[in-house]
Structures are given as structure tokens and as C-alpha cells.
Amino acid sequence: MTIKVIEGDFKASTGKYALLVSRWNSFVVEHLKDGAIDTLRRHGISDENIEVIYAPGAFEFPLAAQKLADAKRYDAIIALGAVIRGGTPHFDYVAGECTKGLAQVSLNAGLPITFGVLTVDSIEQAIERSGTKAGNKGAEAASTALEMVSLISKI
């Protein structure tokens, strides 16, 4: 008897993708957005099937993602932002609520929401993860979205 294996691939050249993008820390987040769009295009997703939705910040992502999911127009939501630690507990609240909220929306809606939200200790770490030394986490979030759309279609 053979064990059946189900896995996603990156051949999802159809589907509609919402990029939920934070305006806060735009000097980093715009690079994440560019990396995500480039990845989607390289995998055959046309510009007509990519929509960019700007929210003020990562704390606002769960509600915006819920509204996007409720619209039932998207195969996946790619959340892109940067929460940079400062000297107060604000970072912990924003990063934690963003993460929990997006996960809850994803589970409730049965919709892939990929997490391209940087949660970093410094501006340097954010810059490294938005296209320099540590790659582009926006591109990685887009790849994950493609794979999840494919996987869900096979389950």
C-alpha cells in the first residue's frame, strides 16, 4: 500500500490575491510589497488578479482582513507590514494582536492569510528582511500564498 501525499506547488497561475499593506514604516514595507508582486508575477499571476489594499498599520490588519475575506473575491490575502520594537510595550501589543487576529480570520474564513509582517528589534533588522541580507519576506509570503492556494485546492 502506498501512502498518499498531498502538497501544494507554485503553479497557481490563476486566482486573485489581496496584498494588505501597512502604511507605517513604509520605507521598509514598500520593499516587501514590491517583492510580493514580483513573486506573484513570476509565477504567472496577472496584474488584474493582484490588488493592493493599504491599512494604517498592522494593528488594523485583522479587521481589514476580515472585510476582505467576507468579500469572497480573493483566493489568499498576503499581509505585509513592519512592527519595530521601541522602548515601550506597544510593540508587544501590536505584534501579538496582529498575529492572533490574522490567524483567527484565516481559520474562520477558511482562507489562506500569509504573514509577511516583520516583527523586529531594530530598523536594521527590518531593512535586512525587506530585500537585503536576509532576503525579502514579502516575496516569501507571496510564495507561501501560492503554495497554500494550490494545497487547499487539492485537499
Curated annotation (Swiss-Prot):
EC identifiers of the protein: 2.5.1.78
Gene Ontology terms: biological process: riboflavin biosynthetic process
This protein's UniProt keywords: Riboflavin biosynthesis, Transferase
Catalytic activity: (2S)-2-hydroxy-3-oxobutyl phosphate + 5-amino-6-(D-ribitylamino)uracil = 6,7-dimethyl-8-(1-D-ribityl)lumazine + phosphate + 2 H2O + H(+)
GO cellular component: cytosol; riboflavin synthase complex
An annotated Gene Ontology molecular function: 6,7-dimethyl-8-ribityllumazine synthase activity
Alphabetical list of Gene3D superfamilies matching this protein: Lumazine/riboflavin synthase
Enzyme superclass (EC): transferase
InterPro entries: LS (IPR034964), LS/RS (IPR002180), LS/RS_sf (IPR036467)
The keyword Transferase appears for this protein: yes
Protein's pathway: Cofactor biosynthesis; riboflavin biosynthesis; riboflavin from 2-hydroxy-3-oxobutyl phosphate and 5-amino-6-(D-ribitylamino)uracil: step 1/2
Top-level taxon of the source organism: Bacteria
Annotated binding of 5-amino-6-(D-ribitylamino)uracil, by residue: 24, 58-60, 82-84, 115
Positions annotated as active site in the UniProt record: 90 (proton donor)
Subunit architecture: Forms an icosahedral capsid composed of 60 subunits, arranged as a dodecamer of pentamers.
Purpose: Catalyzes the formation of 6,7-dimethyl-8-ribityllumazine by condensation of 5-amino-6-(D-ribitylamino)uracil with 3,4-dihydroxy-2-butanone 4-phosphate. This is the penultimate step in the biosynthesis of riboflavin.
Family: Belongs to the DMRL synthase family.
Record's protein name: 6,7-dimethyl-8-ribityllumazine synthase
Species of provenance: Saccharophagus degradans (strain 2-40 / ATCC 43961 / DSM 17024)
Gene that this sequence comes from: ribH
